[in-house]
């Protein structure tokens, strides 16, 4: 490639990224429940020399030289996460929540059986036989759902655990409106020789802020998570436990069985986010729950069928509605995107096809982090009503959405660069 073509190619990359940054950061209402934004300070520390380095092994026991500061930042991050989530043992090396789950499977259930929430009831694909369990030859037994209440049928689940005797019971979900019965099922799991793992990916920030139960305090043997949803850090994974023997085996699963590089550059940003959650997490998590309730109530008021009304709609960051009467989840998700509102289609308990789901799943954690409160949730609901109930063309609503979003371009509940004396206009996102 000659220099002129190379510069054109670089400019194409630049244009694509700049367009994406402007669109998602400044022009759209982002309601994907599995996403969030880092603070400017966390973003600043995300770019560092560790992005090109290796540190196989564990703290103080590496297979590479030149890792003294890697050991220091990893140890500090482990200490922060241990204190924040009241866990004796923490592994921050998994590069995603799914890899964290895989490490648990390899340690406790390889070639055996696990019991988990089915996908149509909110279970994550990494808990399903079509995902990671199937790759390890693990049979997945489904925990029966309480479809009306968007929860687990405890009595039926107890029966399944006693009859099937899985090595591992998994709670937590991708569609997650209410706490799962950790205490009840942990006791039954232990009585039948099983461990219980709670996948806290969607609610980790709510746990940090005291707005959702910490499953380790309710009898769970392990807690896994990603680090970029309601916990608003960089993408990554983490495993928590208070069981030393399990932890040692987990460490061997993370390395050498599943990873050799842990994407070390994310450690600093994750540490900054942990400090932010220690400082602002309580008020952030509280506002997230208030906002989710308000959005659900406003949508329901307009005749949009938000699920779980009898239970108060939600106790997390998520809001879910049945989009069947509007043409289904895929159609509605596209209509809303055309209007500048980003959501995702999702299976509901009565669905049989992941390709044609009837549900829409939303989360308010990102919009809360840019300073939106309950009044803004009411305005978002009104935009959605205009498209879905009033039948307005999404393109006619898009401009209003863009103007509305222009007032919310600064991250709250976190640190600015100036808070720690850094003077820099070098961040590309300006959010």
Curated annotation (Swiss-Prot):
GO terms for cellular component: cytoplasm. Signal peptide: none annotated. GO terms for biological process: glycine biosynthetic process from serine; tetrahydrofolate interconversion. Keywords: Amino-acid biosynthesis, Cytoplasm, One-carbon metabolism, Pyridoxal phosphate, Transferase. Catalyzes the reversible interconversion of serine and glycine with a modified folate serving as the one-carbon carrier. Also exhibits a pteridine-independent aldolase activity toward beta-hydroxyamino acids, producing glycine and aldehydes, via a retro-aldol mechanism. Pathway: Amino-acid biosynthesis; glycine biosynthesis; glycine from L-serine: step 1/1. Its main location: cytoplasm. Its cofactor is pyridoxal 5'-phosphate. (6S)-5,6,7,8-tetrahydrofolate binds at residues 123-125. GO terms for molecular function: glycine hydroxymethyltransferase activity; pyridoxal phosphate binding. It comes from the Archaea. This is Serine hydroxymethyltransferase. SUPFAM superfamilies: PLP-dependent transferases. CDD domains: SHMT. The lineage of its organism: Archaea, Thermoproteota, Thermoprotei, Thermoproteales, Thermoproteaceae. The modification N6-(pyridoxal phosphate)lysine is found at residue 229. InterPro entries: PyrdxlP-dep_Trfase, PyrdxlP-dep_Trfase_major, PyrdxlP-dep_Trfase_small, Ser_HO-MeTrfase, Ser_HO-MeTrfase-like, Ser_HO-MeTrfase_PLP_BS, SHMT-like_dom. Its EC number is 2.1.2.-.
């Amino acid at each position: 490639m000659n220099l002129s073509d190379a510069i054109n190619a670089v400019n194409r990359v630049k244009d694509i990224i700049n367009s994406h940054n402007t669109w998602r950061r400044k022009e759209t209402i982002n309601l994907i429940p599995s996403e969030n934004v880092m603070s400017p300070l966390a973003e600043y520390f995300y770019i560092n020399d560790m992005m090109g380095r290796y540190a196989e092994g564990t703290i103080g026991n590496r297979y590479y030289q030149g890792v003294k500061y890697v050991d220091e930042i990893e140890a500090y991050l482990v200490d922060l996460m241990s204190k924040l989530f009241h866990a004796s043992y923490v592994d921050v090396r998994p590069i995603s929540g799914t890899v964290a789950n895989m490490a648990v499977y390899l340690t406790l259930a390889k070639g055996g059986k696990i019991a988990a929430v089915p996908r149509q009831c909110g279970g994550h694909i990494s808990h399903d036989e079509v995902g990671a369990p199937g790759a390890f030859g693990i049979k997945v037994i489904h925990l029966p759902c309480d479809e009306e209440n968007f929860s687990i049928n405890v009595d039926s689940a107890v029966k399944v655990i006693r009859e099937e005797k899985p090595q591992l019971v998994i709670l937590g979900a991708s569609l997650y409106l209410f706490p799962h019965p950790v205490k009840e099922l942990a006791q039954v799991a232990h009585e039948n020789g099983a461990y219980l793992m709670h996948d806290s990916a969607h609610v980790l920030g709510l746990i940090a802020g005291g707005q959702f139960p910490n499953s380790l305090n309710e009898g769970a043997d392990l807690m896994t998570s990603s680090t970029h949803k309601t916990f608003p850090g960089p993408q990554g994974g983490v495993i928590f436990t208070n069981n030393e023997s399990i932890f040692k085996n987990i460490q061997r699963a993370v390395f050498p069985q599943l990873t050799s590089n842990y994407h070390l550059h994310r450690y600093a940003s994750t540490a900054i986010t942990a400090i932010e959650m220690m400082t602002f997490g309580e008020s952030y998590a509280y506002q997230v729950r208030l906002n989710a309730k308000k959005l659900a109530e406003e949508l329901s008021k307009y005749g949009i069928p938000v699920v779980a009304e009898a239970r108060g709609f939600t106790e997390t960051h998520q809001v879910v509605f049945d989009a069947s009467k509007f043409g289904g989840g895929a159609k509605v998700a596209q209509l809303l995107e055309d209007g500048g509102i980003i959501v995702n289609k999702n299976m509901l308990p009565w669905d049989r096809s992941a390709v044609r789901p009837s549900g829409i799943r939303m989360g308010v954690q990102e919009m809360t982090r840019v300073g939106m409160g309950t009044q803004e949730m009411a305005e978002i609901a009104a935009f959605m009503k205009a498209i879905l109930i009033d039948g307005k063309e999404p393109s006619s609503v898009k401009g209003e959405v863009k103007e509305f979003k222009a007032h919310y371009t600064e991250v709250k509940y976190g640190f600015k660069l100036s808070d720690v004396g850094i003077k820099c206009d070098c961040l590309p996102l300006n959010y």
